[in-house]
Amino acid sequence: MKTKYFIFTALMLTGIGFASCTKSSSNPTIANLTFLATLNGASEVPANSSTATGTATFTYNPNTYILSGTVNFTGIVATMAHIHLGAVGSSGAIVFPLGGASPTSPISFVSTALTTQEQSDLMNGLYYVNVHSAALPAGEIRGQLIQQ
């Protein structure tokens, strides 16, 4: 009788052990990344003496590949604003338009899913925010997006 009880108990405990073991079917969530930029005329290429200033705060979600954020500026009547591709000290092509024609502060932005190349450029510090004006159509204030 003791043998039957022992075998029954062992089988029950084994069954409970297997039942409590579950394989996670979801991938781990990766934390969002924050990118900040300080915009001013001195950061433009070439630099200018504008007294306008601005800030940009962007969040990149590596789980959805979405970049979103806000650009604030003062002392400028903007005609356009963009995120450009380019290292510090160099100019580059527009990657993402921000706020349409004649945007006002603050500008909010949400991307579609970034491509592998766009993700790489963002992570390598190759994106900058540029706010344009009628006086300086190539860009009045600029700031490099830096991961925090």
Language model feature labels by segment:
Residues 2-5, 15-36:
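Bacterial Sec-dependent N-terminal signal peptides
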Residues 6-7, 19, 61, 128:
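Compositionally biased, intrinsically disordered low-complexity regions enriched in proline and serine
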Residues 10-12:
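Hydrophobic helical h-region of N-terminal Sec-dependent signal peptides
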Residues 29-148:
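First exposed extracellular module after export/assembly in secreted or surface-exposed proteins
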